[in-house]
Amino acid sequence: MLTTPKSYITFIGRIGKKNHQFPRHSCLLTSPFGRKAMQFFDTHAHIGLIYDDPIEQLRVIQQAKQAGVTRIVSINNSLHDFERVYPNLKALPGIYHAVGVAPSEVTNPGSNYIDKIEQYLSNPNVVAVGETGLDYFKQFGDKRSQIELFITQLELAQKHNLPVIIHNRDAGKDVFDVLSERIPDSGAILHCYSEDAAYAKKCLDMNIYFSFAGNLTYRNARNLHETIMNIPLDRILIETESPFMVPAEFRGKRTMPAYLTSTAKFLAEMLEMDLEELSQQLWKNSCKIFKLSEE
C-alpha cells in the first residue's frame, strides 16, 4: 500500500507558497567544531558535457569539492566520449567512472564496442557499466536493437562483477522485464528516477537503487516525492545529471556537481531529517553500490 504522510502534504503546501525559498547553501558545508565536514557523492554527472575544455572540467571538479561534493561518478553516453574525458580525469582523487553505450548510440555503438568496454572496465577507478538502458521517447533505432544493446551490457556487468547504471525514458515496462531476468548480481541504479512509487516498490525485490536528480526539487514532481516516501532510505542515491536537471533554486543555469547539496537539502527537509544524518546515509548507500570504501 502506498503512503502519503501528513508531513509530506504539509511540506508540499509549504513549497507551493510563492514567497517560500530554500536557503542558499554556502560553498562548504561544515559540521560543528571537532567533527568532519559533510561529504556528498554525485552518482551521475556528465562532466564532458558541461565543458569540452579539459581545464574547465578540472575547475568543475574543484568547485564541487569546495561545496562538499567529494566523490563523483563521471558518465559518458558513448565510448568516444569516454576516451575523450577519462584521460583528463583519471588521476583525480574521488572521481570515478562508468563505461557503456547509451541507447542514444544504438545505431552506432562503435566498432568492436564489446571488446572496448571490457578493456576499459579494467581501467583504474572504473566502478560501473553504463549508462545503458532504453529510451523510447526519441525512438533511437528500433526497440529490438535497444534491448539487445541493453542486454549485452547487463551481461558484461555480470561478467565483471560490477553494477549497471540504467537510463529509462518512456520504457519502464521493458526495463523492468529485462532486469527481472538479467539484473547483474552487483545490482543496478535507476538513474534520474522518473517512474512512480508503485513501479519503485515492484523493483524493491531486486538489488536496485533509485537515484534522484535536481528535478526532485520541482513542486510538480509528485511522482518522485511519493516514491521517496515509499522506498527504504538505504536504497536512495542522489545525482546531478549535470549539465541537465538543474535544481529549482538554480533554474536557468547549467547543472554543476556543486549543486548536489541543493537536492540533498530538499530531500532532508522532505524526510524531516537532519542534513548531516542524511548525508551520511547517502554516502553509505553510494559507497555500497559502487563497492568503495566509506573512508
PLM regions: where:
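Mid-domain alpha/beta scaffold segments of enzyme catalytic cores
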Residues: 4-14, 20-295
